[in-house]
Design a protein with these regions (language model features):
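Conserved, structured core segments of small domains
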Residues: 1-102
């Protein structure tokens, strides 16, 4: 599992994806969030990561940690369907690291 030092190292508008509490990247597929929470408290961010069992995305922007429960799917179609059902703004394409807006 990552620790607070990992979160402190995030620059503004920086993030990472976790699987089982460890940073991970993929060469293909799509990452989609099903729910999320935000906090300015780094200890609360760690609590949320543990609550999601380390299967989440972490984004840091302007002093706020965004913690999203997320998972990888194979197709854009599936990612967009889940994203829309869960009222997400966008999904991430691993191949290009670009966003597709729901």
């Amino acid at each position: 599992m990552i620790n607070i030092r990992t979160l402190r190292k995030l620059n503004n508008n920086d993030g990472l994806t976790l699987k089982g509490g460890k940073p991970i990247t993929y060469k293909s597929g799509w990452q989609v969030a099903t729910e999320g929470k935000e906090t300015r408290d780094i200890n609360e961010a760690m609590r949320l990561i543990r609550e999601y069992k380390g299967n989440c995305g972490v984004w840091y922007s302007d002093g706020v940690y965004y913690i999203d429960k997320s998972h990888r799917v194979n197709t854009k179609r599936e990612a967009m369907l889940i994203g829309r059902q869960c009222q997400q703004i966008s999904v991430l394409c691993w191949r290009t690291m670009g966003l597709a807006y729901c």
